[in-house]
Amino acid sequence: MCTSRQIIGSLLVLSVLEIGLGLSSVAVGAVTFFRVRMEQKPQLGDSSPVWSGACFLICGVCGIFCAKKKSGLIMILFSACCICGLIGGILNIQFLRALNKRSSSLYSLYLASMSLACIGISGCTISTWLTCRLASYEQRRMFLEREHSLHHSHEMTEKDTENITNGGGPLALNGRV
């Protein structure tokens, strides 16, 4: 079983990868969009690599926040960003598949964008899974801390009760025995 430190380390690595993929996707998408504008009339989906890259970029930044501060709300935010990254990547692939059938002059750029989207989708999927593992680990840790705290307070209560009932010495009230 992975430790919390290993999960956080993996999450940091994947988050940095997502940031890199996001920046690369935005760059390739911008180049593709400007080449399309020079060669032909822009169509629906020409800017989809930019949008999916933005989703991957946001996902990576939230992943770094999630790894640094393991609060429940940040984990939920990160999971939501990963789901948005998944949706953005899938839509990017679908739009580019349709555009690739119409124009073969930009095939290499479309292929690069689809490859980046596939890697980004995989990263988002693994990040979501790791976040669920981290949340489960944190929940278990908090439960054990609470259980230990309750067990400790229960032991202290038993000792106090035992001292009173078993003649554990006279009780001092206001300094008097």
UniProtKB/Swiss-Prot annotation:
Q: How does it sit in the membrane?
A: Multi-pass membrane protein
The regions listed as transmembrane in this protein's record are 11-31, 47-67, 73-93, 106-126
Kindly report the protein's main subcellular placement as a broad class. cytoplasm
Gene responsible for this protein:
tmem196
Question: Could you tell me the keywords of this UniProt record?
Answer: Cytoplasm, Membrane, Transmembrane, Transmembrane helix
Which species is this record about?
Answer: Xenopus tropicalis
Please give the residue ranges the record annotates as the region Disordered.
Answer: 152-177
What is one cellular component GO term in this UniProt entry?
cytoplasm
Where are the compositionally biased (Basic and acidic residues) regions? 152-162
As for subcellular location, the record says: Cytoplasm; Membrane
Instruction: Please indicate if the UniProt record lists Mitochondrion as a keyword.
Output: no
Q: What name does UniProt use for this protein?
A: Transmembrane protein 196
